[in-house]
């Protein structure tokens, strides 16, 4: 199944709820089949991660599970590996999709991203990223000259 693609802007309400675009909801709501019924299961859970670039990253359970498997390989007895695990889980939260297609973001998550009223949601293949609109535009304009060299180097 194709990844998340596209960009939409939505308002965050006074309770910190953000509407997930319908085209993205369709993608992550259809997970593996329910073992009991054989029907496609619906998983309204998303993992929210505070990224270093000031955005929030949203992961569906199957994608986060792959990352978690990598973390499980790290040793609690290795100080660097233990630190990394602690730092990742300290930046992670879990939220659920409500019946209106919204997720509730904690004040801590909103503050990290600088989101007050509006947010831009970008489909970024296996994840979605959530940005404060001006912060995103500043990042894109400040780095516009880097696009072609980066694209030529990595894709």
Curated annotation (Swiss-Prot):
GO terms for cellular component: cytoplasm; nucleoid. One of its GO terms (biological process) is negative regulation of DNA-templated transcription initiation. InterPro entries: MraZ (IPR003444), MraZ_C (IPR035644), MraZ_dom (IPR020603), MraZ_N (IPR035642), MraZ_sf (IPR038619), SpoVT-AbrB_dom (IPR007159), SpoVT-AbrB_sf (IPR037914). It holds the Pfam family MraZ. Keywords: Cytoplasm, DNA-binding, Repeat, Transcription, Transcription regulation. Forms oligomers. Belongs to the MraZ family. This is Transcriptional regulator MraZ. The lineage of its organism: Bacteria, Pseudomonadati, Chlorobiota, Chlorobiia, Chlorobiales.
